[in-house]
Amino acid sequence: MTKNNYKKPFVIAEIGCNHKGDIEIAKELIKVAKIFCNADAVKFQKRNNKELLTEQQYNQPHPNPANAYGETYGLHREYLEFDINQHAELKAYCEEMGIIYSTSVWDLTSAKEISSLHPLFIKIPSACNNNVEMLIWLCQNYKGEIHVSTGMTTKSEI
């Protein structure tokens, strides 16, 4: 990406966890983003749920059981997570399709794992933009761009 050289909007297709934990659905969403939406990039999410959630949060029931993929909120989140090898497969598929791969990282472990894939950029969700340990690690170790969302952040927190 080039900065301050505006020619057209840079479109990022937010896939998030809409793949329902199925890598083939994820690949189909990449294809749709590229072919039908002409997106420049796709973005997934990566969480280490045991690191991100408290034990109580992990073990509580999903707030909407009809939409749950597991007995607890933690198991639901685990079902939706791709491991690092699956993320590498998705990145390779993106390269094959001619679209940029990226991921939002929600914790330090996920930041370390995803940065090992050397994506062009990593996004920090607004819910995690005060995770100082993760931000310092990324600034010191990750060579790509870091995009920080501030949607859930007050001016004083920024």
Describe each PLM feature range.
Residues E14, A33, I114, S149:
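Conserved, mostly hydrophobic/aromatic
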Residues V11-A13, D40-F44, Y101-T103, L120-I124, ...:
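Hydrophobic faces of well-ordered beta-strands that scaffold small-molecule active sites
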Residues M1-A13:
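N-terminal amphipathic alpha-helix/helix-capping segment at the start of soluble metabolic enzymes
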Residues G16-N18, Q45-N49, W106-L108, A127, ...:
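Active-site beta-loop-alpha junctions enriched in small/polar residues
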Residues G21, D40-E81, S110:
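Glycine-rich, proline-tolerant flexible connector loops at the mouths of alpha/beta enzymes
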